[in-house]
Regions:
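Nucleotide 5′-phosphate-binding alpha/beta core
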Residues: 1-128, 134-151, 155, 159, ...
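Active-site glycine/GP-rich loop and adjacent strand/helix microenvironment
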Residues: 1-28, 32, 36, 190-492
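Conserved ATP-dependent adenylate/AMP-binding module captured primarily in the ANL superfamily
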Residues: 56-59, 149-167, 204-216
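Hydrophobic alpha-helical segments that mediate membrane insertion or helix-helix packing
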Residues: 129-130, 168
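Short secondary-structure capping/junction motifs at helix and strand boundaries
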Residues: 136-140, 162-167, 194-197, 273-275
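Short glycine-enriched loops at secondary-structure junctions
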Residues: 146, 173-177, 225
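Conserved AMP-binding loop of ANL adenylate-forming enzymes
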Residues: 154-190
Length: 492
């Protein structure tokens, strides 16, 4: 039985007490005894696991990042982060009372202790990081970890206020990535009727639309770009979508401007007052977090699970831990994993507004909340901060500007070299599919003015292309992630 309802009513002081207790126990009974990486790290750094008693004591433990999971000469390095108990380690690190209690519980259930421990720790499932910045890194799940995935999925269903008699449609790409499986397992845990189509790559947009109209789900879940594409396609065909009440988006940032555009398109198809939720997750945590219903396309922030993890916000330059509500880089520590375990993992994600506590102004839950204003540099680090025409720019600013122009239906930004010569000047081309009956000349000037004002960089060319060509350029129906910003510059 999940204790979520009780956890959402805890005070901030009680949350800290709970996390302190779980942190101390987890490190001493699971991480230090069974993790090859952390056993070696603690011994080399002379860290006594018994001295890790509170969240403040985490400062004794060094940060890790994705580079620590990837060994140039050791492609199996990720296995060092997997808990690997054996009979000797259990006898050495677990008190006899704990072993006897576990043995008694197994006996009462008609099981053998060895079998129960194997189910708890043995890897049986795997997902990968998406590999946009480095080689994909595998992360393992035991039966215990899959139960946690189920629980987090059911918690999100509760946050979305989806009832047991509602139907949902999972449009995330079918792949060994977190988003699809979080929805798949969460729906089962919540006893929901769910159709998982695998997204555009598996059934195609026509197939997904046919299924959507047949089962009439109250909620659909997927990548923002594909959900937008599917809803727009339904609008072109003149279909009624009044049965839709909730849209859940993941695997990419969701802005208020996007929510507004999607809401207007849904409203034109009969779907009025639809709640549009953003979610946040990453493979290393093997879970995701969600917003609760908020009016006017605002964000409640992502409701966290204080019994399952500790988050810190740090200064990305100095590593100093920041106060509640401060901006900084997000750092993740697991409190309840059995296979791949991360302590103080630097996500590379920068949060404006940090973490807040106290009752949520929308649902009243008292769980910690993470600001949804997140720049996911880890998604595209190689080009996110880039020099274009000699000016250092954050390419996410281009996305914010172009996505916020209502006259634009779809867009893509390409950075290239003149004549494809690596020693030539940079060129920036914006491909645009405008809304119907938009004056292209006026829109072109508006795009130039807004981009120059926000980034100090003006595009060399703005190309207007038809929607079907844009869909192919973005790979909306063929790739797991849209190709929104392309850096086509050849290396010198």
């Amino acid at each position: 039985m999940d204790s979520w309802r009780g956890i959402t009513s805890l005070t901030y002081s009680q949350i800290k007490d709970l996390q302190n207790q779980r942190l101390h126990s987890f490190i001493n009974t699971h991480v230090y005894p069974f993790s090859p990486y952390y056993t070696k790290l603690f011994d080399e750094k002379k860290i006594n696991p018994r001295h890790i008693r509170t969240r403040e004591d985490l400062k004794r433990i060094p940060y890790i990042s994705k580079s620590d999971l990837i060994g140039k000469d050791n492609p199996q390095k990720f296995k060092d982060f997997i808990l690997q108990p054996d009979k000797e380690k259990i006898s050495r690190y677990w008190p006899k009372s704990r072993i006897l209690a576990r043995a008694l519980k197994s006996m009462l259930l008609g099981h053998h202790l060895q079998e129960d421990l194997a189910k708890e720790f043995r890897p049986v499932f795997m997902t990968f990081t998406t590999g946009t910045t480095n080689a994909p890194v595998p992360f393992m799940y035991s039966r215990y970890d899959l139960d946690n995935l189920n629980v987090s999925g059911a918690r999100m269903v509760g946050l979305f206020d989806i009832k047991g008699d509602e139907r949902i449609m999972n449009l995330f790409p079918f792949a060994p990535h977190l988003a699809f499986w979080q929805v798949f397992f969460g729906a089962i845990e919540a006893d929901l009727f769910a159709l998982s189509t695998g997204g555009g790559k598996v059934m195609g947009t026509e197939g997904n639309l046919t299924a959507l109209l047949r089962i009439k789900p109250s909620a659909i879940l997927g990548v923002p770009s594909y959900i937008y594409h599917l809803v727009r396609y339904a609008q072109e065909k003149g279909h009624d979508l009044s049965f839709l009440k909730k849209i859940v988006l993941g695997a990419a940032k969701v802005t208020s401007a996007y929510k507004q555009k999607l809401s207007e398109m849904l409203s034109a198809q009969g779907a009025k007052n639809v709640y549009i939720f953003g979610t946040y997750g990453f493979t290393e945590a093997r879970t995701a977090w969600a917003e609760c219903p908020a009016e006017n396309h605002l964000s409640s922030g992502y409701h966290l699970y204080p019994d399952k993890e500790i988050f810190e916000i740090i200064d990305p330059e100095t590593g100093e831990v920041k106060d509640d509500g401060a901006d900084g880089e997000l750092v993740y520590t697991s409190l309840d994993s059995r296979t791949s375990v991360m302590l103080r993992y630097r996500t590379g994600d920068f949060v404006k507004g940090g973490i807040t506590h106290g009752p949520c102004p929308y649902c009243g839950r008292q769980t910690l909340r993470l600001s949804s204003n997140i720049t996911r540099l880890s998604d595209n680090k190689d080009i996110q901060l880039s020099k274009v025409k000699g000016t250092l720019v954050n390419l996410s600013h281009f996305a914010e500007v172009l996505s916020g122009i209502p006259q634009i239906n779809e867009w893509q930004l390409e950075i290239r070299k003149h004549k494809n010569d690596p020693y030539e000047v940079d060129e920036m081309v914006v491909y645009v599919t405008p809304q119907p009956e938009v004056n292209q000349s006026a829109l072109s000037q508006l795009i130039k003015d807004k981009l120059t004002g926000a980034t100090e960089v003006s595009p060399n060319e703005i190309k207007f292309i038809p929607l079907d060509e844009m869909v192919k350029r973005l790979e909306l129906e063929t790739a797991n992630k849209e190709k929104r910003i392309l850096d086509s510059r050849p290396k010198a």
